[in-house]
Amino acid sequence: SGKVRMMEAYNYQMSLKDDFIGDLWKKIVKNKIENQVKVLEFGNQLSFIKLKNYTLELKPHDSTNIEGSSALLYWKMIFSNSLDYFTRNKDDIRNSSLNYGYAILRSIIANSLTCKGFILHQGIHHKNQQNQFNLADDIIEPFRPFVDLEVYNMFELEGIDEENLTKDIKKRLLSIVD
């Protein structure tokens, strides 16, 4: 029954050992970086080789913060065709589009995890006590580059020139999960 399955998922989640959690987070970060490499390869960015090498340096729990180092390089390169250096500024349409796309993914992941009986506030790496979606925020990481690629396509390749999220941009971002 559904209640038994939920209890099994809960018990499993609560019984995970630190070594397993560390290795799991390492795999999540590795998959995220590998997908970021694919985005940069798609955009013919030569720096994807350096980004790819970061996956070789990963340790359990990402104790050396390779995710942070790779993110600095990734964000520097992904929108390098722009006249200005891209920052995750709240007024930047690319950033608004990324956040919108991530919110779509997060809600789908959170719903799927909840339906399987997992406790969302019990994350693998994310541990914020005020965040009810720590686990979803962990699981989303390897999927973020799919949103990044769509935003890259819209604003860098197609040259969409909007200042605000339009209905068409929102539709495109929603289509990622189709």
Q: What are these language model-derived features?
A:
Residues 5-178:
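Active-site helix-to-loop segments that bind/position phosphate- or nucleotide-bearing substrates
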Residues 1:
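Catalytic nucleotidyl-transfer cores of nucleotide-processing enzymes
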